[in-house]
A protein has these predicted regions:
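Short loop/turn segments immediately following beta-strands, especially the blade-tip
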Residues: 1, 46-53, 92-102, 149-158, ...
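Residue-level detector of Asp-centered blade-edge/turn motifs that repeat once per structural unit
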Residues: 20-23, 73-77, 131-132, 181-183, ...
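Short glycine/acidic-enriched loop and turn motifs that connect beta-strands
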Residues: 31-37, 86-89, 143-145, 193-195, ...
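Asp-box/WD-like beta-propeller blade repeats and closely related beta-sheet repeat scaffolds
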Residues: 54-126
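Surface-exposed loop and turn segments in beta-propeller and other repeat-based domains
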Residues: 60-62, 105-119, 163-167, 211-224, ...
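Loop/turn-rich, solvent-exposed surfaces of beta-rich toroidal or solenoidal domains
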Residues: 227-293
C-alpha cells in the first residue's frame, strides 16, 4: 500500500529528485528558465527528517542553463551533477558537510544537432554515474549522442572521456540511461523513435558500444502521433529492464541476458493512467510505482521475480502531476 505521511514542500517547478547516499538529504532540480531572478533553472537541497519524511530547505544554486530536467549524486555523496534540457549543458556542485550545495564547480556546454525538428540544438536530458564512480553518462536528445565524462567527485569536476561519446541512430533522441549492476552493460531509452539501446560498457575508460536496438512497443506495433518514451531503470537483480511509453501509457518489460547484455521482450503493461513520465522500482525489487502525470495518479505494481512481468495491485493514489520518485532506504 501507499500512504502519504508528509505534506507538500513548495518549490519552483521541481521535477527530478535524488536522495543522498546517507539518506539525510534530497536534491531537486527546478525546471525553469528564470530562477532567483536570473536566467536559467536551479537546483535545491533539502534536509530529510527520517522520522516524519518532512523536508527542510538548505539552499539553492543556479543550474546555468534553461530547464534542468535530471540530476545524479555520486556514489560517495560528495557531489551532484545535473543536465539542462533547453540549455543543452551540464553542471556539477560539491556537497557540504551539512548537505548544502556549493556554487557550480564545473559547467560544460554541449553543441550539435540531428535530423528531427526537435534536434536543432543540444538537449542534455539525463546524467548518470557508473558503478565504480569513475565516469558519468549524459544522454543528449538533440545531438543523438550519449557522452561520457571522467568524474572527480572530490573536486566536483567532469572531463570528457576518450572516446567522448557514442552515436545513436539518427533521429532516435537519447533521453534516459541506466547502468547494469554488474558493470559490463548499460541501457538507454530513446524518446523520439520509441526504442531502447543496449550497450557494452568498458568501465576502465568509460567507453560505450552499441549492441542492440529494440522497440519499446509490442511486436508489430509502430509509433503513433503523440507517443514518446520517458523513464528507464534496471531491476535491482540485474535480470530485467523497464521503460515507460507516454501516449501508449505502458511500461515495457525486457529480460536481460547476463552474458551478452542483449534484451528479450517480455510485455507492455498498462499504467492504469496516462502519460507515465516516470516510475520507480523499490530497493527490494518487489514493486514498481508508475507515475501518471496527466491523470494525477501513482499506480502500484507487483514484480514477478522470475519473469519481470508486472501485475497491478489495485492500488492507485492521487498525486498532482507526478514526474519523479526517489526511495529513502
Amino acid at each position: 500500500t501507499l500512504t502519504r505521511i508528509a505534506g507538500v514542500t513548495k518549490s519552483a517547478e521541481p521535477s527530478f529528485v535524488a536522495v543522498h547516499p546517507s539518506g539525510k538529504y534530497l536534491y531537486a532540480v527546478n525546471e525553469t528558465s528564470e530562477f532567483m531572478g536570473k536566467p536559467g533553472g536551479g537546483i535545491t537541497a533539502y534536509a530529510i527528517d527520517r522520522l516524519t519524511g518532512t523536508l527542510t530547505k538548505l539552499n539553492s544554486q543556479l543550474s546555468h542553463g534553461d530547464h534542468p530536467c535530471h540530476l545524479m549524486i555520486d556514489r560517495s555523496g560528495r557531489c551532484v551533477a545535473l543536465a539542462n534540457y533547453t540549455g543543452g549543458s551540464i553542471a556539477a556542485y560539491k556537497i557540504g558537510k551539512d548537505g548544502s550545495l556549493s556554487e557550480a564547480t564545473c559547467i560544460i556546454q554541449h553543441s550539435g544537432s540531428s535530423i528531427d525538428p526537435r534536434q536543432q540544438s543540444a538537449h542534455a536530458h539525463s546524467i548518470d554515474v557508473d558503478l565504480n564512480n569513475r565516469f558519468v553518462a549524459v544522454s543528449d536528445l538533440g545531438m543523438d549522442q550519449v557522452l561520457t565524462y571522467r568524474l572527480n567527485a572530490r573536486k566536483g569536476l567532469l572531463n570528457p572521456a576518450d572516446p567522448p561519446f557514442v552515436k545513436a541512430v539518427p533521429g532516435a533522441g537519447p533521453r534516459h540511461f541506466a547502468f547494469h549492476p554488474q558493470g559490463a552493460f548499460a541501457f538507454g531509452i530513446n524518446e523520439l523513435d520509441l526504442t531502447t539501446t543496449a550497450y557494452a560498457y568498458d568501465g576502465r575508460v568509460g567507453k560505450l558500444q552499441s549492441l542492440q536496438v529494440i522497440s519499446t512497443l509490442p511486436p508489430g506495433e509502430t509509433k503513433q502521433a503523440g507517443q514518446s518514451t520517458a523513464e528507464m531503470y534496471v531491476h535491482p537483480s540485474g535480470k530485467f529492464l523497464y521503460g515507460s511509453n507516454r501516449g501508449h501509457h505502458t511500461i515495457v518489460v525486457y529480460q536481460i541476458d547476463q552474458q551478452t547484455g542483449k534484451l528479450t521482450y517480455v510485455e507492455n503493461e498498462g499504467t492504469h493512467g496516462e502519460t507515465p513520465r516516470s516510475f520507480g522500482i523499490d530497493p527490494t525489487g518487489r514493486f514498481l510505482l508508475a507515475l501518471n502525470q496527466s491523470t494525477n495518479t501513482i499506480a502500484l505494481f507487483r514484480i514477478n521475480q522470475d519473469t519481470g512481468a508486472l501485475e497491478y495491485t489495485g492500488t492507485s493514489v492521487p498525486c498532482p502531476a507526478p514526474v519523479a520518485t526517489a526511495f529513502l532506504r
